[in-house]
Design a protein with these regions (language model features):
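Substrate-binding N-lobe of the ribokinase-like
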Residues: 2-4, 8, 14-15, 37, ...
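Positively charged, low-complexity intrinsically disordered leader regions
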Residues: 1-33
Length: 111
């Protein structure tokens, strides 16, 4: 029975629609040598920064890497973070025609 199901999936691969928050994940790497005198927070000496697809972008990237036919439906701002997300999706050949760009919102970023 499982073999029949697998054969059906191979004959007609499913298309998956991913709906959700498309966000930019930012990772900051550095070292801490001291604490700020104004507040009890660490002062980070930045060594490198990475940015990648987050939220629904992470899901659609994983589906794409698995070879699954998929499409993304989401909203991002008309800002530099939105540009970066659109470029990263395009680099992975992920369909972006259903990603709406609005100048009235800012693209969500997580650090």
């Amino acid at each position: 029975m499982l073999a029949q199901l697998i054969n059906r999936i191979k004959e007609k691969p499913p298309t998956i629609l991913v709906l959700g928050d498309l966000m930019l994940d930012r990772f900051i790497f550095g070292s801490v040598d001291r604490i700020s005198p104004e507040a009890p927070v660490p002062i980070v000496k930045l060594k490198k920064e990475e940015q990648m697809l987050g939220g629904s972008g992470n899901v659609i990237r994983n589906l794409s890497n698995l070879g699954v036919q998929s499409s993304l439906c989401s909203v991002v701002g008309e800002d530099s973070s939105g540009d970066l997300l659109i470029n990263q999706l395009a680099e992975k050949n992920i369909e972006i025609s259903n990603v709406l760009r609005l100048n009235s919102i800012r693209t969500t970023e997580k650090m």
